[in-house]
């Protein structure tokens, strides 16, 4: 009798993706982040589901309902802390996953890469609307500031902002629709993840050498299934440690104050994982220019495959491009730091220099380094 695992229409799909999948034998720990992101998504959907059972999306009760979850619901404090800090881990894994893609030239698989960039945007949207739900000071003012950016759109800007708000300011209608968006978006993300995997399995995984690995493949199970489980254990341990020992480390103290439209916090800033983009937004004195720079800071990833000039796929054997990659990493960290600082000297100028460098690296320096390395390869 034929093996059910290989013949059943549904189980066969799972088998081809998780058991008999041919994987390059040399993929390193940097290839663990895809499965870790899957784990993050499942964790967030489950904890979010239990939070949604007790949360009320009304401005008069939203803040109290979050307090009620933490005080009165069985293990509500744990579910809430896991959900809030799970978002941080989601973004850490996502940024590392993107960095891996940039370093090892995984953007050569254009469909997989572009769906990945769309996924990044979807998750950022989900996190933004989710941050508004507790209805604390930073929730309210963050929502006000970021949604207000849409007023920079020529001609239709003001109408667009009022349409999203459902009125003339961030109010009850805004909170209700943001809760609806926050509930539906993770399922759209899950659908996009399936597409992401579908396109990935058309080509197979890249590997650290950037060479064709058809001659040296191993089964996904048991080799990489166990490797992924090790990653799961490490990440869950880190997440649980953060959620139990220092759950508010990455949050903003302002959000412990209920939203008040009459009192503006001294420093309005988003969660830490958006600070680099926020720094780019703030470094341009013009509103529309800032919004475009903010958008392009993520969308620039879409044109990375077009700007690939090197004869080699990965940076493994390209020291100049490697140096520029690490400059980009340092630049992102500087932008993250600047995004959390007040708008005053010397932070303004540092942010502007870091923003210019960010785009120059992507659009000019890294492609030029690729051309230079090609030249050096052809030297006799």
Curated annotation (Swiss-Prot):
Heme 1 (or BL or b562) is low-potential and absorbs at about 562 nm, and heme 2 (or BH or b566) is high-potential and absorbs at about 566 nm. GO terms for biological process: mitochondrial electron transport, ubiquinol to cytochrome c. The chain crosses the membrane at residues 33-53, 77-98, 113-133, 178-198, 226-246, 288-308, 320-340, 347-367. Belongs to the cytochrome b family. Its main location: mitochondrion. Keywords: Electron transport, Heme, Iron, Membrane, Metal-binding, Mitochondrion, Mitochondrion inner membrane, Respiratory chain, Transmembrane, Transmembrane helix, Transport, Ubiquinone. The cytochrome bc1 complex contains 3 respiratory subunits (MT-CYB, CYC1 and UQCRFS1), 2 core proteins (UQCRC1 and UQCRC2) and probably 6 low-molecular weight proteins. Component of the ubiquinol-cytochrome c reductase complex (complex III or cytochrome b-c1 complex) that is part of the mitochondrial respiratory chain. The b-c1 complex mediates electron transfer from ubiquinol to cytochrome c. Contributes to the generation of a proton gradient across the mitochondrial membrane that is then used for ATP synthesis. One of its GO terms (molecular function) is ubiquinol-cytochrome-c reductase activity. Binds 2 heme b groups non-covalently. Its cofactor is heme b. It is found in: Mitochondrion inner membrane. Heme b b562 binds at residues 83, 182. A ubiquinone binds at residue 201. This is Cytochrome b. The keyword Electron transport applies. It is a multi-pass membrane protein. It comes from Arapaima gigas (Arapaima). One of its GO terms (cellular component) is respiratory chain complex III.
């Amino acid at each position: 009798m034929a093996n059910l695992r290989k013949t059943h229409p549904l189980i066969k799909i799972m088998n081809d993706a998780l058991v008999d999948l041919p994987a390059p034998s040399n993929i390193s720990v940097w290839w663990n982040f895809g499965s870790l992101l899957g784990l993050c998504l499942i964790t967030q959907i489950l904890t979010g589901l239990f939070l949604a059972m007790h949360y009320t999306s009304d401005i008069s009760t939203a803040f109290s309902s979050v307090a009620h979850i933490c005080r009165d619901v069985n293990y509500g404090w744990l579910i809430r802390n896991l959900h809030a800090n799970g978002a941080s881990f989601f973004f850490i894994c996502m940024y590392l996953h993107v960095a891996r893609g940039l370093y090892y030239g995984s953007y050569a698989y254009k469909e997989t890469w572009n769906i990945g960039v769309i996924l990044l945007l979807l998750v950022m949207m989900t996190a933004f609307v989710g941050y508004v739900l507790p209805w604390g000071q930073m929730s309210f003012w963050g929502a006000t500031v970021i949604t207000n950016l849409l007023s920079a759109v020529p001609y239709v800007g003001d109408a667009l902002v009022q349409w999203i708000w459902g009125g003339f300011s961030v109010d009850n209608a805004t909170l209700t629709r943001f809760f609806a968006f926050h509930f539906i978006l993770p399922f759209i993300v899950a659908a996009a993840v399936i597409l992401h995997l579908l396109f990935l399995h058309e080509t197979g995984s890249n590997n650290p050498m950037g060479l064709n690995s058809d001659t040296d493949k191993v089964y996904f199970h048991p080799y990489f299934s166990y490797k992924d489980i090790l990653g799961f254990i490490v990440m869950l341990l880190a997440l649980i440690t953060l959620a139990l020992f220092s759950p508010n480390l990455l949050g903003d103290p302002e959000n412990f104050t209920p939203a008040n439209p009459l009192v503006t916090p001294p420093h309005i800033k988003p969660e830490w994982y958006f600070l680099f983009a926020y720094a780019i937004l703030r470094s341009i004195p013009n509103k529309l220019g800032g919004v475009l720079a903010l958008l392009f800071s993520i969308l620039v990833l879409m044109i990375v495959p077009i700007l690939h000039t090197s004869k080699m796929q990965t940076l493994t054997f390209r020291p100049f491009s490697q140096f520029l990659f690490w400059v980009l990493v340092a630049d992102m960290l500087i932008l993250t730091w600047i995004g959390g600082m007040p708008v005053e000297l010397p932070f303004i100028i540092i942010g502007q220099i870091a923003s210019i460098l960010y785009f120059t690296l992507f659009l000019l320096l890294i492609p030029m380094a690729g051309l230079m390395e090609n030249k050096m390869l052809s030297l006799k």
